[in-house]
Regions:
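Alpha-helical transmembrane segments of multi-pass membrane transport and lipid-handling proteins
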Residues: 86-114, 165, 169, 173, ...
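Hydrophobic alpha-helical transmembrane segments
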Residues: 124, 153-201, 217, 367-375, ...
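Membrane-proximal transmembrane or re-entrant/amphipathic helices at the cytosolic face
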Residues: 436-489
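N-terminal membrane topogenesis motif
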Residues: 1-25, 79-82, 86-87, 119, ...
Length: 489
């Protein structure tokens, strides 16, 4: 199997499993938005955003270094991942407990900063999720580093299904916002149990692990990871901190929640890309490695036309899911979706640079975005509010994406094909223009999304971007994905 096929096959399995979050998240978000109203939904969104930001920040500090460390050990000896896995488990567990402590102590101050006194109680409840989340992530890095993509996909599917069931059940029972947060914690317990049934790294094995090998990658990636995580949800935090009410935060948070697909793609692809590319380089498969880099760059550009589809149908989609009171969410979504795709470009570029041994070059794209975003939000939010925050986020993310591509060009001497750029631009423009002139509501929104997506795919085929072999590969891989099954190859 080629390196590109391995990544496509593995990431398609993980994406299909993570894509379970789409219907579950839409059902859950729509239920909670109608049940809570803009004010309580805004408070819920703010709580989840803060804790999720902390969890993914802590994970991103070590995830790529952990995958590369385990993948290198696995290539050297298929059974030699246990010391590396034990080291990863110990680091993630300690970090999770520290995160719980910091969030517990800081919650009153965060409530005061956001002008929401009740936020402190909600944060302390959801803080219990941090160590559970981190330990589960350690198990997932082991699965990815050892090539167990199907099992990684199964774990993801259980998480999203468990979260939806528990949240809806507890809120329906009358537990309100606290019930929804408790459902998230309960889903993490389920996810950890499933992950543990597949792989069992032990902290005791870490004594035999080579800690310096992991830290050699973790340290240079630390600053880049912190910067990217600070950028994530920075717009929502600054919007609220600069005086926006809970209702505005709820509307803005709803728009952010609808940008979930790019995040799923980044989650599905980047660590698998790093694992496979690292193995190809270590095995001396230079041709396979370069082909994989080329296809990774091409793939992220082809996400933009589908962002255009979402932008064109944004208002109808927002009102269908959240209700008429969330109609302003549509305009915000049409901007934020492109910023989310730009962040995927940065994430993929970071994986390519890390695999090439140029982890410090990831700083080129990551470091400038936070100060640029802070300056932009301070200038724009007081005058333009939520719409200004969305534009600043998209613009800064685009700058970071360009810088990331420049760094990849220096490391791999490769640049996205001009033809791909032009065809992606054409398809994106057509999707936006047609979608903006086609007004739908209710169930017809799904018809609009299907028609626009089909139109984009046909455009890419007609213009020669997608070859018959690529279409066949995509259909075969997706057809073989079984994310809910415990049986894996």
């Amino acid at each position: 199997m080629s390196a590109t096929s391995e990544v496509f096959g593995g990431s398609s399995r993980v994406f299909v499993a993570e894509a379970v979050s789409l219907p579950t998240a839409i059902i859950t978000a729509g239920f909670l938005a109608r049940r809570f109203g803009p004010d309580d939904y805004g408070l819920f969104t703010l709580t989840v955003a803060i804790v999720a930001w902390l969890e993914w920040t802590l994970t991103s500090l070590f995830a790529r270094a952990a995958v590369k460390h385990i993948a290198d050990a696995h290539v050297a000896d298929a059974d030699d991942w246990r010391p590396a896995g034990g080291m990863v488990l110990r680091v993630f567990a300690i970090t999770g407990m520290l995160g719980l402590f910091v969030l517990w102590v800081a919650s009153p101050s965060l409530g005061a900063l956001m002008h929401e006194p009740s936020l402190s109680r909600h944060l302390r409840l959801l803080a219990l999720d941090v160590p559970l989340f981190m330990v589960t992530q350690a198990h997932q890095q082991v699965m990815i580093g050892t090539g167990q993509y199907g099992r990684r996909a199964t774990v993801a599917a259980w998480r999203w299904m468990g979260r939806m069931v528990l949240m809806l059940a507890l809120v329906s029972a009358g537990f309100g916002v606290d019930g929804a947060l408790a459902g998230i914690v309960g889903a993490s317990v389920v996810e950890l149990a499933v992950a543990r049934s597949f792989v069992k790294p032990r902290v005791g094995d870490a004594r035999r692990g080579n800690a310096s090998a992991m830290w050699s990658y973790a340290v240079p990636l630390f600053a880049a990871a912190v910067s990217l995580r600070l950028f994530d949800r920075l717009d929502l935090f600054m919007l609220k901190g600069l005086g926006a009410g809970a209702a505005i935060a709820g509307i803005y948070g709803a728009a952010q929640n609808l940008t979930i697909v790019p995040g799923l793609i980044a989650l599905s692809v980047t660590t698998l890309l790093l694992s496979t590319l690292s193995r190809a380089i270590r095995l001396g498969d230079d041709a396979g490695a370069r082909s994989l880099v080329h296809n990774a760059l091409r793939g992220v550009l082809l996400l933009f036309p589908f962002a255009g589809v979402a932008a064109g149908a944004s208002t109808g989609l927002a009102t269908l899911i959240f209700g008429a009171r969330f109609a302003p969410t549509g305009a915000l979504l049409s901007v934020l979706i492109f910023g989310a795709i730009a962040v995927v470009v940065i994430s993929v570029a970071s994986a390519l640079l890390t695999a090439a041994g140029k982890a410090t070059w990831a700083l080129i794209a990551a470091l400038p975005i936070v100060p640029l975003a802070v300056a932009g939000h301070l200038l724009v939010i007081p005058r333009y509010g939520a719409s200004g925050a969305a534009v600043v986020t998209m613009t800064v993310a685009a700058v970071g994406a360009v810088l990331a591509l420049v760094a990849v060009r220096r490391a791999w001497h490769m640049w996205p094909a001009i033809g791909t750029i032009l065809r992606a631009t054409l398809a994106t423009t057509v999707a936006i223009v047609v979608g903006s002139r086609w007004t739908t509501s209710g169930a017809m929104v799904f018809v609009e999304l299907a028609v626009l997506s089909t139109m984009v795919i046909l455009l890419l085929i007609v213009t020669g971007e997608l070859t018959p072999r690529e279409r066949q590969l995509a259909l075969s891989r997706l057809g073989r994905s079984r994310p809910l099954s415990f049986r894996t190859k």
